[in-house]
From Swiss-Prot:
The lineage of its organism: Bacteria, Pseudomonadati, Pseudomonadota, Gammaproteobacteria, Vibrionales. It comes from Vibrio cholerae serotype O1 (strain ATCC 39541 / Classical Ogawa 395 / O395). It comes from the Bacteria. Involved in chromosome condensation, segregation and cell cycle progression. May participate in facilitating chromosome segregation by condensation DNA from both sides of a centrally located replisome during cell division. Not required for mini-F plasmid partitioning. Probably acts via its interaction with MukB and MukE. Overexpression results in anucleate cells. It has a calcium binding activity. Coiled coil: none annotated. Interacts, and probably forms a ternary complex, with MukE and MukB via its C-terminal region. The complex formation is stimulated by calcium or magnesium. It is required for an interaction between MukE and MukB. InterPro entries: Chromosome_partition_MukF, MukF_C, MukF_C_sf, MukF_M, MukF_M_sp, MukF_WHTH, WH-like_DNA-bd_sf, WH_DNA-bd_sf. This is Chromosome partition protein MukF. One of its GO terms (biological process) is cell division. GO terms for cellular component: cytoplasm; nucleoid. Pfam families: KicB, MukF_C, MukF_M.
Amino acid sequence: MSEFTQDTVQKPIDELVTWVKQYDFSLNLPTERLAFLLAIAVLSNERFDEELGEGELHDAFAIVTRLFAESGEASAFRANNAINDLVKQRLLSRFTSEMTEGASIYRLTPLAIGITDYYVRHREFSKLKLSIQLSMVADEMAKAVESAQQGGSVAHWRKNVFGVLKYSVSEIFDRIDLNQRVMDEQQQSVKEQIADLLNKDWRDAINNCEALLSETSATLRELQDTLQAAGDELQTQILDIQECVYGDLELDFIEETLFALQMKLDRITSWGQQSIDLWIGYDRHVHKFIRTAIDMDQNRAFSQRLRQSMNDYFEQPWYLTYADAERLSDLRDETLTLRDEEVTGHVPTEVEYEELQQVNDELAQRIGDMLKVHKEQGAAIDLALVLRDYLASHPRTHHFDLARMVVDQAVRLGYSESDYRAIQPDWTAINDFGAKVQANVIDRY
């Protein structure tokens, strides 16, 4: 919230409401009207007196209408309606004088200047990276700290410290806040684009999704830089100035300004950390969706047709086209520790901090030794029966990971003749909690 807005809200709210009601203030600016207002602002800035005639407004309306082709032709009637609408909403002031022979001249009102100035200035300022904006703030704060450490009269503090903090540092903080809100909109836009791509054709969309996710990573790095710079250097500078004014009653106005800046800084850093968490969570969600949820061949229909086509190749030849896409980046943690809820009983000290990967390697070795017996004896491996017997002696929370490792070790030993005959196996239960597996008996090694 800007300093002016903070001063305004301290006034009685009913007084402001009565004022708005008395003068019948209202705003209705569709996209085309807003574009017309911005075009008028640009033309006004090019004029020394910032005054425009009706002809110039009609020309501006024609330019806008040409870019909004679906809205209709740029007739004089529609242009006059648009001008009158802006005048009615107190965005344009109309003047008529004898010097202009009855023709009207127009100027932007303070309200219109505030609206257009926001869009024009914000468009230019939002192009700056947050790291650059924070560097600008740090430079201004350094000037204020230097002046504060020099000390001096109250006039010195008002000119060289208070002025810099209130009208320079505070302004940049407000712009950073606006830029952060734009980044929130960009985050939502990226989510919508990814959802739209995946809903249309996920095969062709994976590369596009990866490009969008790379933008996410760039944003993450920028947010982390923002937190580091804002949380360290700026905080130190604020504390340095507070130390200089501590206990001096004549400099209470400096302390009030520092308190307002501290609130803005806290808001920036808090927003940054929250956004980082949201970006990471969404990035992992999309990668998980691409890895697991996009399974368009759950019934193995495609694999069966492919095997059948290979068997019939000499009778019905065909061409194979394949795409070698780059692998998606996996942003999961490199190592995961054992979950507390999975640890039961007394845990020995030597394995208390053992990582999950080490446990997986040990279990995989044991499972491999168990399955080698089937290979040595030439016996078939019915994965459904093997899994059911093996999982029965382990806690339920371990079933998913253990089943994955059993299947992984089994397919390394051999394969099923039924797979090459395109025979689809039935789903078979492997525990008493609803878990099922669909796999042919491994009978070739």
